[in-house]
């Protein structure tokens, strides 16, 4: 069943689109969009890339590109970049996700009730970190990055 059909049966849900520059969110109540509850957070994956690249350069004296970060996050700890580099990337990504979810919580979204639908390329990239955070009880991921 498509995600939207499921949303119509839920009292409330929030859609989070993690993009390059921002993470946009929109609340849905009983299948209806609530435009009074939509905004953007300054939590796009480009910020994450920049944090990781800076930390890797200063701490490990290594120059990572965005494609390197993507490869590590999509492969997990068993990447070919080495344990130290992979651990740094994984840690920074988890901190980034925790900050983003904390910002949503500050905006009065209870992520442990209802559904949180993650869309966009950033959501696919950070899926493991979102699931590992323990802050979202029922995450739903839309894998098609063009679906939003």
Locate the predicted segments by residue:
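Nucleotide/phosphate-binding catalytic cleft detector across ATP-hydrolyzing
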Residues: 1-13, 32-46, 68-74, 79-116, ...
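Short glycine-enriched loops at secondary-structure junctions
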Residues: 19, 122-123
């Amino acid at each position: 069943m498509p995600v939207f059909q499921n949303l119509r049966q839920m009292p409330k849900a929030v859609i989070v689109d993690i993009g390059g520059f921002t993470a946009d969110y929109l609340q849905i109540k009983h299948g209806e969009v609530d435009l009074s509850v939509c905004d953007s957070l300054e939590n796009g994956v480009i910020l994450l890339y920049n944090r990781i690249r800076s930390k890797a350069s200063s701490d490990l004296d290594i120059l990572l590109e965005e494609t390197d970060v993507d490869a590590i996050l999509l492969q997990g700890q068993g990447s070919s970049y080495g344990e130290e580099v992979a651990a740094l990337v994984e840690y920074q990504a988890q901190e980034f996700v925790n900050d983003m979810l904390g910002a949503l919580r500050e905006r009065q979204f209870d992520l442990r009730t209802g559904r949180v639908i993650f869309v966009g390329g950033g959501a696919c990239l950070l899926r493991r970190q979102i699931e590992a955070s323990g802050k979202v009880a029922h995450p739903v991921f839309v894998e098609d990055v063009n679906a939003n």
